[in-house]
Amino acid sequence: SDSTVFLLQPKPIRAKTRHAYTDWEANDYYRVSTPHFDIYTDSKPADGVKIARQVERLYSVWQQLFVEFWCDTAVLAERFNGSNKPLYARKRHQIILFSSREEYQGFFKRRTGATVNSVGFYAAEQKHSFLFVSDPPKASTWLHEVTHQLFFELGAQVPDVAAGQNIWAIEGVAMYMESFREHGHFVTVGGFESYRLQFARYRKTV
């Protein structure tokens, strides 16, 4: 992985305007921006920084694992001959990080009238990932939902993807990325550390 991503030190900035989507008032939340993400949170600044660093590392690894999904390989071939054409259309990915599960549930209750029991959610229509701070952190959920986000926003956008079939592939690859683990200046993916991946292995082998 690009070693610079391990040195990333994003700075939280107290927002000066009302947040259009959550209705958080000015000065009541923070924005943490990285090269590829904007994280908005009403939690402690350190919480925003923590997830910002993690999703940037995920982004770096995701790009390397799934290069043919997001990259124009014909342009990549031209790059080796000196071309400077962009490999893909860069986008900024939006994440809302609530300070607690109660805040998270309250947000969806106000918007939909329904009680939400999930621990994280990527909304393809709004192009936002919705997450919340917990102790211990639900890092696997962050990795899972942002993986959905990257596939949808950087690949061919298919309306209602997996609504009728192939949900196993969509959820399977997100679960695979839950196994993302950092080891100093390198990472691993696909190891036994992923709790939910063990159920898939069990069903395959037993």
What are these regions (language model features)?
Residues 1-139, 163:
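Non-catalytic architectural context of zinc metalloproteases
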Residues 126-205:
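Zinc-dependent metallopeptidase catalytic helix centered on the HExxH motif
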